[in-house]
Amino acid sequence: MYCLGLMSGTSVDSIDAALVKITGENVDLEIELLSGINHYYPEKLRQTILEVADGKPLSMERLAELDEEIALCFVEAVNKIKQKYSTVALIGSHGQTIYHRPPFKEKLGYTLQLGRGEIIANLTGIPTVNNFRAADIAVGGQGAPLVSKIDACLLSHPQHHRCVQNLGGIGNVTYLPPKEEKNWENRIIGWDTGPGNILIDLAVNRLTHGEKTYDNNGEWAAQGNPHSQLVEQWLKQGFFQQTPPKSTGRELFGEAYLEQCWQDAQVYNLSETDFLATLTELTAASIAHSYQQFLKDPIDEILLCGGGSHNLYLKERIQSHFPSTTTVKTTDEVGMNSDFKEAIAFAILAYWRYVSKIPGNLPQVTGAKQARLLGDIHLPLNS
């Protein structure tokens, strides 16, 4: 079955569209990536999304308009794929997160992804699954990370302890025990590790007055020196001490957090390059800190994916926190495209919801009280 996954993350850099051929049943799947593209938001729309995600108030009327505008951009991404592949049978659309609140004590969490699935289905003529996180949250889960079950299916190793570390705007990890070990499936865990690219990207945007949006290959940060005392200070923040299940987003690690980091850096008179190096070090150190706190077994391989996997300086800094017996590489090196891995995941989640009708979440990862079917199904007109 030809399934198209659509994903736009907290960085709001583009809509990732990945067309995959899925064969097999339930969790015994084979995946072939046929096409992957990045479809960019118009800059004005992107800025609006970022402002809303950072807490700018807007009317319900404007929210409804924004929901539709985002859906139409997702439709454009689908149509680009359809120009070459007319046999797309199913769409899994994550949508665009503009708000995420983890559960707290007895209070359920809440999440809001814009980009109406019914519009995508009707305008493309393809059944569409969206709103994947809500069902997990409704039974007490974090609604994230949702990729862990897919990581287990596609990236587990018979003998190696692996961590699949996504480096999108926010970082998240899936720990995969060796498949040959007893009850390995029940020992899979995952959580959000903290900032991935988000603080680095926001800082680059600030320092270049909007001319650049990311640090290409980490070349700018690599010219500086990270300030270890400042990193240690930042790691005392409450989220880094919180035990999994846990999730986060721009609500915590956004513009306001960057401003506080900037003010902290002024105390030490850091240069721009040292500031970027220190933010990069925070991402690397928070990952290492997280593993050391919450994982019992030594890790054989760390598999990086997402936009940050291209940041060579970040990759180097992550490796520096682990012994030489732990290999840091990208998922590309084990056969999984690192740029489109998240989009591929939502194609699979849609397949599980629409075709296999099996749960997509792992309760031990999200904290949900039970496994649930994830996503709302939207059928096109006249179907």
From Swiss-Prot:
UniProt-recorded name of the protein: Anhydro-N-acetylmuramic acid kinase
Keywords annotated in UniProt: ATP-binding, Carbohydrate metabolism, Kinase, Nucleotide-binding, Transferase
Transmembrane region(s): none
PANTHER family, per the entry: ANHYDRO-N-ACETYLMURAMIC ACID KINASE (PTHR30605:SF0)
Taxonomy, superkingdom: Bacteria
Similarity comment: family membership: Belongs to the anhydro-N-acetylmuramic acid kinase family.
Gene name as annotated: anmK
This enzyme's EC code(s): 2.7.1.170
Recorded catalytic activity of this chain's protein: 1,6-anhydro-N-acetyl-beta-muramate + ATP + H2O = N-acetyl-D-muramate 6-phosphate + ADP + H(+)
Gene3D superfamilies for this protein: 3.30.420.40
Functional description taken from the UniProt entry: Catalyzes the specific phosphorylation of 1,6-anhydro-N-acetylmuramic acid (anhMurNAc) with the simultaneous cleavage of the 1,6-anhydro ring, generating MurNAc-6-P. Is required for the utilization of anhMurNAc either imported from the medium or derived from its own cell wall murein, and thus plays a role in cell wall recycling.
Organism name: Crocosphaera subtropica (strain ATCC 51142 / BH68) (Cyanothece sp. (strain ATCC 51142))
Residues annotated as binding ATP: G9, T10, S11, V12, D13, S14, I15, D16
Pathway the protein takes part in: Amino-sugar metabolism; 1,6-anhydro-N-acetylmuramate degradation; Cell wall biogenesis; peptidoglycan recycling
A GO BP entry: peptidoglycan turnover
GO molecular function: ATP binding; kinase activity; phosphotransferase activity, alcohol group as acceptor
InterPro entries assigned: Anhydro_N_Ac-Mur_kinase, ATPase_NBD
